[in-house]
Amino acid sequence: MKALWHTLWQGQDIAVCRDSVEVDRFNAQQIERVLLLHRGTGDSPGDVVQVVIELTDHCLVFSADTGIAGRINFERQSYWAERGCVHWVNIARAPLPLRLRTGHGLLRLSPPPFARVARADVAGMIAKWPVQGAQTWDERKRLRIERAQPLSFEHA
């Protein structure tokens, strides 16, 4: 039977659980940057495939199935807006070490739902990613709506 991974807020910490047993925990104040890796344009919450959270010495890599994207996009929104640390990257332009990569089509890779890796091991790769943001989900949605609006002219 497949293990059930999930994340949840506990005070100022985010706990990572496997089958309801806590396996990791980190304080949200330690987060330096959140990278939401998405397919397509990233305009839908379902486009987020993986999340990389950069701490001082480690990177935490989550699959979307853990619910971490929901913790970032829809819970404590004012906290994330104030922090200005949420960024977006198209997954096609965001290579990770093979064991952490997700895939589709003929290349169906199955990365672990959660991994804590030394930041030094992935920093060189992440530095080359074309990062967008900082912007929360609400800011991203608002920009998408504005881009879809026909040009409007104000009359003096």
Show which residues each predicted segment covers.
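Eukaryotic intrinsically disordered, low-complexity regulatory linkers and tails enriched in Ser/Thr/Pro
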Residues: M1-A156
